[in-house]
Amino acid sequence: MFQMAKRAFLSTTLTLGLLAGSALPFLPASAVYADPDTAVTNKQSFSTDVIYQVFTDRFLDGNPSNNPTGAAYDATCSNLKLYCGGDWQGLINKINDNYFSDLGVTALWISQPVENIFATINYSGVTNTAYHGYWARDFKKTNPYFGTMADFQNLITTAHAKGIKIVIDFAPNHTSPAMETDTSFAENGRLYDNGTLVGGYTNDTNGYFHHNGGSDFSSLENGIYKNLYDLADFNHNNATIDKYFKDAIKLWLDMGVDGIRVDAVKHMPLGWQKSWMSSIYAHKPVFTFGEWFLGSAASDADNTDFANKSGMSLLDFRFNSAVRNVFRDNTSNMYALDSMINSTATDYNQVNDQVTFIDNHDMDRFKTSAVNNRRLEQALAFTLTSRGVPAIYYGTEQYLTGNGDPDNRAKMPSFSKSTTAFNVISKLAPLRKSNPAIAYGSTQQRWINNDVYVYERKFGKSVAVVAVNRNLSTSASITGLSTSLPTGSYTDVLGGVLNGNNITSTNGSINNFTLAAGATAVWQYTTAETTPTIGHVGPVMGKPGNVVTIDGRGFGSTKGTVYFGTTAVTGAAITSWEDTQIKVTIPSVAAGNYAVKVAASGVNSNAYNNFTILTGDQVTVRFVVNNASTTLGQNLYLTGNVAELGNWSTGSTAIGPAFNQVIHQYPTWYYDVSVPAGKQLEFKFFKKNGSTITWESGSNHTFTTPASGTATVTVNWQ
């Protein structure tokens, strides 16, 4: 009862403090927020977090004794292809001096922590090293230049004590550069298991790697089953590789990491990744997001399909592209920004789980000499108040510049806490914990022209309204603005840092005002919810018996009922119930997609749709069909007797279109699928051209899946 009263007091205090312009919300997160949905212990949701992406080697050298020696190291960090000395002790030092807490970030996404190759590689006369962490050799050991296992554990413990989560980069797509015909090149892509050699790229008699040449990125299949540049590409249909990565990630989960960023998900089979995610969620579920690089593409159906079916979220490149076009490059306007918000909300089942960003290590930094600081500050404000989980690339708060690799990965230039960008982040980041409209809310455009965008975030009764004028020379007269803000006066949360103003609302109607040139303002209102309202369910996928976390507001302190579709879960199957968070065991129901609801004190919540219940433990099976000739316009698909195979549907839940170019060639087709372990499957292939379906004849094919590992089943078209 004391805890509930304490939370109610904090909620009221925070609301009044924000309206009065108080500095209270800008205390370190760990000092203020106690609700379980906002706590550092909530590994299943990052909705209330702001991520800070740091290249470990480029941030701070906290322990010079672990630096490389010889040609791999440049103490001046003037050669950005070499190691510069940054390590986990450097991160620990900045955690302890409150740099991150004062900035307002509550999660650190660090470079892949695993052991990388020690060899240097000469490309076109330039020495290259594995400073970036993406040239792994042993996924069960640490990169000694970052620190020891004890150092890594200390990093996690120190971060958690400050209310900061740790996200690791993880790259199960490949090891390191290799040449089939030259075992002396680099380390020949060799993979180790805690120091024991598993195998190398040359003479790969066990089939641990693909040997199909380099990808030309001409198709999804080409990118999956051919090498990414010269990197030794894993064959995930190999049972040894499958087990290796399911075991390796558990090692890091057991150390206490809070999240995973998966590299190059576009270049690995969806089926294997879904199976891998299922094993993670059955072990220790954490928020996981992948990198599906889109470049400047507006959208990609395969990208959307992956986000909705793999069990993980994605880095939101559509958001990134739109923000850069509008605020950085001036190639688009606010209507395009609003269109992106609307289209992604339609396409992604869980749009609030996608990770938003304005730049990262694989693209030119947002800031250049030609980009006004105010445009960067506005892009940050938009990202921090928009739907999705915001990620800030290290040095952005210091206006770090750099076009392309390696200049976009320069050494952290300073740790100033007085820049305007730092100030913007520090004022807006805490809103994700204090106002559920920012963490969980919907988005609605309220006023717009080419240069001005006013949008509203709303969750239950909580509201945030954001106004941005990207025109740096002309103010805008805002008239007829209608919002959900209750009657009252509202101060700019930014305190005028970006020339924002205060406003007055009369039943949601805002008095006419002038939005200054280059201005951004944020106004917000929070109040306690009296009815159950779901903001997030995580993970988004699981098997019966797994525990999932439901976050939101207004659940009350007395256990109610959780519904998966029409199946009610009560009693001991609900392992905890608090006003902002519920933990519940997935019931034994038929596999498929379900709407999750909460009933508290006789009142039903909103529905949280598209939660995926799996049949059970998952394995990856490669389905191969021979002699399936098609006509122009036809593609081949697979369906079968379990939800993971589409439950005999020929619609969007069917598997495919199948591939026929790399592992097997037309008229043989194949596809890797995550299916239930130890299960007798019945399945058929079918040809599809638009709405025209051509089924195989004869009886259903049958196959019993293994209890673990991987398998291949090959049939003839009948």
From Swiss-Prot:
Homology family: Belongs to the glycosyl hydrolase 13 family.
Subcellular location: Secreted
Cofactor note: Binds 2 calcium ions per subunit.
Metal-binding keyword on record: yes
D as annotated region, ranges: 529-614
Listed name of the protein: Cyclomaltodextrin glucanotransferase
Positions of region (A1): 35-172
Binding site for substrate: 134-135, 174, 227-230, 261, 266-267, 361, 405, 409
Keywords (A to Z) from UniProt: Calcium, Disulfide bond, Glycosyltransferase, Metal-binding, Secreted, Signal, Transferase
Chain spans, region A2: 237-440
Residues that bind Ca(2+) 2: 173, 224, 233, 267
The record's note on its domains: May consist of two protein domains: the one in the N-terminal side cleaves the alpha-1,4-glucosidic bond in starch, and the other in the C-terminal side catalyzes other activities, including the reconstitution of an alpha-1,4-glucosidic linkage for cyclizing the maltooligosaccharide produced.
Site-annotated residues for Transition state stabilizer: 362
Binding-site list for Ca(2+) 1: 61, 63, 66-67, 85, 87
Catalytic activity as recorded in UniProt: Cyclizes part of a (1->4)-alpha-D-glucan chain by formation of a (1->4)-alpha-D-glucosidic bond
Domain IPT/TIG: 532-612
Signal peptide start and end residues: 1-34
Entry-linked InterPro entries: A-amylase/branching_C, A-amylase_C, Alpha_amylase, Carb-bd-like_fold, CBM20, Glyco_hydro_13_cat_dom, Glyco_hydro_b, Glycoside_hydrolase_SF
Organism: Niallia circulans (Bacillus circulans)
